[in-house]
């Protein structure tokens, strides 16, 4: 693979702030030469590739030593970008990493754009678009299962599936072309209407099966959106804090203290649960609280799971009954809190599968996690170890468009259209799938995607 010609770029690859180590990364033809200008140690042009080399970063203008470093020297093409890469490992800190970055830029490097290292890896054929996107998914993964799914995508699980499907579609199109251009070739099977119907059904089944993983993939990537609802002061925020095992929401005895929607994540069996602590849903004249209530209602409508909290020490109120009614069609778990107090709630008016808890005394909180696991994981088989899951909205949209093109082929077949006239829609399916891997993606899309990456990646 011949890499494209680019100027040499540089960026800080570690988070800005104090830390044990900071890394300034360079990529491009002049990486070694630029690093050598500011490095006092071994001659980098002579060191073996993929080695760490001890020395100091020195300002060539005044010979001031900036830091004691280890330099990682990696020669193309066996690097992430398939270009020469230098990684300067410094002591962590904002000042020292910035000083070294500015030195590299002064000596000939250019400040990298967000995601430019990964973009070069894509443009140089090191990764395709799905693998590049997987890099960001790994960075943003909140649990081990989300990370594992992203790692599989980085390893090419989705790419291989899409590429194999595209190849089968291309073979079908080639067969049609041969039938049209060389009808005298008896050794090539004729693409009959029936055979085209079978091929189309095969492609549809494969893409539909992949699309059906989108819900699971979304959960792995974004978490189970979980709204904690209940009238004011029944213990919603205390439950949130208990699940998180830290204080993040405001907990007081004053009704209405949660005036907004608070979002936090908790790890349930390796899958992120996005907990949304809502303001108590009640009528109020307080404008700020009204906004929180409206957001709570919206969160309830959009939630994958609803945790409805009721107060066991009080009879059911009209608000409780309203919440039971509006959440009955949701994926819901009803929680009876404050069971350490005298029970006054009417159990005969509640669902039979309630969970009795005491947030104050941390009683039966583990049963909530068990019920969530049953609802989403055990019953639904949510996460299979070796499966490939669609988790990217762009991929999902393109698979849906590809299926629409295949449905157009089917409609044409039902109408009795000749096979050769259906090539347009079949070709469109092939092109759409190419947008997923980047083989047929427009430059504007590629630029937009990589602009979402962080600097230094």
Curated annotation (Swiss-Prot):
<dbReference type="InterPro" id="IPR031168">
    <property type="entry name" value="G_TrmE"/>
</dbReference>
<protein>
    <recommendedName>
        <fullName>tRNA modification GTPase MnmE</fullName>
        <ecNumber>3.6.-.-</ecNumber>
    </recommendedName>
</protein>
<feature type="binding site">
    <location>
        <position position="87"/>
    </location>
    <ligand>
        <name>(6S)-5-formyl-5,6,7,8-tetrahydrofolate</name>
    </ligand>
</feature>
<dbReference type="InterPro" id="IPR027368">
    <property type="entry name" value="MnmE_dom2"/>
</dbReference>
<dbReference type="GO" id="GO:0030488">
    <property type="term" value="P:tRNA methylation"/>
</dbReference>
<dbReference type="InterPro" id="IPR004520">
    <property type="entry name" value="GTPase_MnmE"/>
</dbReference>
<dbReference type="GO" id="GO:0046872">
    <property type="term" value="F:metal ion binding"/>
</dbReference>
<dbReference type="InterPro" id="IPR018948">
    <property type="entry name" value="GTP-bd_TrmE_N"/>
</dbReference>
<keyword id="KW-0460">Magnesium</keyword>
<dbReference type="InterPro" id="IPR027417">
    <property type="entry name" value="P-loop_NTPase"/>
</dbReference>
<feature type="domain" description="TrmE-type G">
    <location>
        <begin position="223"/>
        <end position="377"/>
    </location>
</feature>
<feature type="binding site">
    <location>
        <position position="252"/>
    </location>
    <ligand>
        <name>K(+)</name>
    </ligand>
</feature>
<feature type="binding site">
    <location>
        <position position="258"/>
    </location>
    <ligand>
        <name>Mg(2+)</name>
    </ligand>
</feature>
<feature type="binding site">
    <location>
        <begin position="252"/>
        <end position="258"/>
    </location>
    <ligand>
        <name>GTP</name>
    </ligand>
</feature>
<feature type="binding site">
    <location>
        <position position="457"/>
    </location>
    <ligand>
        <name>(6S)-5-formyl-5,6,7,8-tetrahydrofolate</name>
    </ligand>
</feature>
<dbReference type="GO" id="GO:0005525">
    <property type="term" value="F:GTP binding"/>
</dbReference>
<keyword id="KW-0479">Metal-binding</keyword>
<feature type="binding site">
    <location>
        <position position="257"/>
    </location>
    <ligand>
        <name>K(+)</name>
    </ligand>
</feature>
<dbReference type="GO" id="GO:0003924">
    <property type="term" value="F:GTPase activity"/>
</dbReference>
<feature type="binding site">
    <location>
        <position position="233"/>
    </location>
    <ligand>
        <name>K(+)</name>
    </ligand>
</feature>
<comment type="function">
    <text>Exhibits a very high intrinsic GTPase hydrolysis rate. Involved in the addition of a carboxymethylaminomethyl (cmnm) group at the wobble position (U34) of certain tRNAs, forming tRNA-cmnm(5)s(2)U34.</text>
</comment>
<keyword id="KW-0630">Potassium</keyword>
<dbReference type="InterPro" id="IPR006073">
    <property type="entry name" value="GTP-bd"/>
</dbReference>
<keyword id="KW-0819">tRNA processing</keyword>
<keyword id="KW-0547">Nucleotide-binding</keyword>
<keyword id="KW-0342">GTP-binding</keyword>
<comment type="subunit">
    <text>Homodimer. Heterotetramer of two MnmE and two MnmG subunits.</text>
</comment>
<dbReference type="InterPro" id="IPR027266">
    <property type="entry name" value="TrmE/GcvT_dom1"/>
</dbReference>
<feature type="binding site">
    <location>
        <position position="25"/>
    </location>
    <ligand>
        <name>(6S)-5-formyl-5,6,7,8-tetrahydrofolate</name>
    </ligand>
</feature>
<feature type="binding site">
    <location>
        <position position="254"/>
    </location>
    <ligand>
        <name>K(+)</name>
    </ligand>
</feature>
<feature type="binding site">
    <location>
        <begin position="233"/>
        <end position="238"/>
    </location>
    <ligand>
        <name>GTP</name>
    </ligand>
</feature>
<feature type="binding site">
    <location>
        <begin position="277"/>
        <end position="280"/>
    </location>
    <ligand>
        <name>GTP</name>
    </ligand>
</feature>
<dbReference type="GO" id="GO:0005829">
    <property type="term" value="C:cytosol"/>
</dbReference>
<dbReference type="GO" id="GO:0002098">
    <property type="term" value="P:tRNA wobble uridine modification"/>
</dbReference>
<keyword id="KW-0378">Hydrolase</keyword>
<dbReference type="InterPro" id="IPR025867">
    <property type="entry name" value="MnmE_helical"/>
</dbReference>
<dbReference type="Pfam" id="PF12631">
    <property type="entry name" value="MnmE_helical"/>
</dbReference>
<dbReference type="Pfam" id="PF10396">
    <property type="entry name" value="TrmE_N"/>
</dbReference>
<comment type="similarity">
    <text>Belongs to the TRAFAC class TrmE-Era-EngA-EngB-Septin-like GTPase superfamily. TrmE GTPase family.</text>
</comment>
<keyword id="KW-0963">Cytoplasm</keyword>
<feature type="binding site">
    <location>
        <position position="237"/>
    </location>
    <ligand>
        <name>Mg(2+)</name>
    </ligand>
</feature>
<dbReference type="InterPro" id="IPR005225">
    <property type="entry name" value="Small_GTP-bd"/>
</dbReference>
């Amino acid at each position: 693979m011949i890499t494209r010609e680019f100027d040499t770029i540089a960026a800080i690859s570690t988070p800005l702030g104090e830390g044990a180590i900071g890394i300034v990364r360079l990529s491009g033809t002049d990486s070694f030469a630029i690093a050598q200008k500011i490095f006092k140690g071994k001659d980098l042009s002579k060191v073996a590739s993929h080695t760490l080399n001890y020395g100091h970063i020195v300002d060539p203008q005044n010979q001031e030593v900036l830091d004691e470093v280890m330099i990682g020297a990696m020669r193309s093409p066996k690097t992430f970008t398939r270009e020469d890469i230098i990684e300067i490992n410094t002591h962590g800190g904002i000042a020292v990493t910035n000083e070294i970055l500015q030195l590299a830029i002064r000596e000939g490097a250019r400040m990298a754009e967000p995601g430019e290292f990964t973009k070069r890896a894509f443009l140089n054929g090191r990764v395709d678009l799905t693998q590049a996107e997987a890099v960001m998914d790994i960075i943003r993964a909140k649990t081990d299962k989300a990370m594992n799914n992203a790692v599989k995508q980085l390893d090419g699980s989705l790419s291989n599936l899409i590429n194999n499907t595209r190849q089968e579609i291309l073979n079908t199109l080639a067969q049609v072309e041969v039938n049209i251009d060389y009808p005298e070739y008896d050794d090539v099977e004729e693409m009959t209407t029936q055979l085209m119907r079978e091929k189309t059904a095969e492609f549809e089944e494969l893409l539909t099966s992949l699309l059906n993983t989108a819900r699971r993939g979304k959960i792995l990537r974004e978490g189970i959106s979980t709204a904690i609802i209940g009238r004011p002061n029944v213990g919603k925020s205390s439950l949130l804090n208990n699940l998180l095992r830290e204080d993040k929401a405001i907990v007081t005895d004053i009704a209405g203290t949660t005036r907004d929607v608070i979002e936090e994540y908790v790890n349930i069996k390796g899958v992120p649960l996005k907990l949304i602590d809502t303001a108590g849903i009640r009528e109020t004249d307080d404008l700020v609280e009204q906004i929180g209530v409206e957001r709570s209602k919206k969160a309830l409508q959009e939630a994958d799971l609803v945790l409805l909290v009721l107060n066991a020490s009080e009879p059911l109120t009209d608000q409780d009954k309203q919440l039971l009614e509006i959440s009955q069609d949701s994926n819901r778990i009803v929680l009876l809190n404050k069971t350490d107090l005298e029970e006054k709630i009417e159990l005969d008016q509640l669902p039979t599968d309630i969970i009795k808890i005491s947030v104050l005394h941390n009683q039966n909180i583990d049963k909530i996690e068990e019920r969530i696991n049953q609802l989403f994981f055990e019953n639904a088989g949510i996460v299979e170890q070796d499966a490939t899951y669609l988790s990217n909205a762009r991929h999902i949209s393109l698979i849906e468009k590809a299926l629409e093109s295949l449905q157009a082929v089917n409609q044409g077949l039902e109408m009795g259209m000749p096979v050769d006239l259906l090539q347009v829609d079949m070709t469109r399916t092939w092109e759409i799938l190419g947008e997923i891997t980047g083989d047929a993606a427009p430059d504007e899309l590629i630029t937009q995607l990589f602009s979402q990456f962080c600097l230094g990646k």
